[in-house]
Regions:
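Short linear recognition/processing motifs and adjacent strand/loop elements at protein termini
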Residues: 1-213
Length: 213
C-alpha cells in the first residue's frame, strides 16, 4: 500500500464530534489573573477564528475580512503585547502581534463576538486536542482526516518574517487545536491555540474541508 508521505495529499473534513461546550478553567481561574488585556472582534455573521504562536509572534486569523482600528487594538493590549499589525487580505482578517514573555492566551465567544484574552498569572486555559488520523481513499491513497466540527474557510498567509506560506483553518469552537506539533517530510502541523495550521515543505500538498455529518 502507498505510504502517507508518498501520497502527498491532505484531506481535512468537518465531521461530527462530541465537544465540551465550555472550558471550566476559563471562569474558575479568572479571579487569579494578575493582569489581563482583551481584544474584542464583533461580526455581523458567523465567523471562525484561529490563533497560534510562531517564533516571537502571536497570530490571530479570521476567515472573513474586516478593517480594524489597529491603533485602538494596540492601546488595548499594552503593556502585555506590542507591534500589532493587520496583514492585507481581501478574504480574511489577519493580525500579528508580539506578546511579552510568559503571556498566556485564551479565546472566548459571546454570540457573534470573539474575545482574545492576553493575561499573566493564573492557570493556562487548556487547549483541547484535535484528533488527526491516517485514512485511505478508494484508490488506497493515504490522507489525513481530522473530524472537526465547524471548521471555516482555509486562509493562506505569507509569513514575511520567514518567507513561507502558512495554511490556516479557523474553527468556530474555542480553545481547540494542536497541542503537540506533527512533523512530516512534506509539511508540518504546528502547535495552535485554536484551529489548524500547516506549513508546507512541498508544492503538491492539498487541503480539503467538507462536511461528513
Amino acid at each position: 500500500s502507498q505510504s502517507f508521505e508518498e501520497s502527498k495529499r491532505i484531506i481535512i473534513y468537518t465531521g461530527k464530534e462530541q465537544n465540551d461546550n465550555a472550558v471550566a478553567e476559563e471562569e474558575n481561574n479568572s479571579h487569579t489573573l494578575l493582569k489581563v488585556r482583551s481584544l474584542s472582534f464583533s461580526w455581523n455573521q458567523p465567523t471562525n477564528i484561529a490563533a497560534f504562536k510562531r517564533g516571537k509572534y502571536l497570530w490571530i486569523v479570521f476567515d472573513r475580512h474586516q478593517n480594524l482600528d489597529t491603533k485602538e487594538l494596540s492601546e488595548n493590549i499594552a503593556p502585555l503585547a506590542k507591534d500589532l499589525y493587520q496583514l492585507p487580505n481581501p478574504q480574511a482578517t489577519i493580525l500579528r502581534l508580539t506578546p511579552g514573555d510568559d503571556i498566556k492566551v485564551g479565546i472566548r465567544k459571546e454570540g457573534l463576538l470573539w474575545i482574545v484574552d492576553l493575561y499573566t498569572g493564573g492557570k493556562s486555559i487548556p487547549t483541547r486536542e484535535v484528533p488527526v488520523f491516517t485514512r485511505y481513499d478508494a484508490l488506497n491513497r493515504a490522507y489525513l482526516f481530522a473530524p472537526v466540527t465547524d471548521a471555516g474557510n482555509i486562509v493562506s498567509i505569507f509569513d514575511p518574517e520567514i518567507g513561507d506560506i502558512i495554511s490556516v483553518i479557523p474553527f468556530n469552537t474555542t480553545n481547540y487545536g494542536i497541542t503537540m506539533p506533527y512533523n512530516y517530510p512534506d509539511f508540518d502541523f504546528i502547535k495552535t491555540i485554536n484551529g489548524l495550521v500547516l506549513i508546507y515543505k512541498a508544492d503538491d500538498i492539498s487541503i480539503t474541508t467538507g462536511n461528513s455529518g
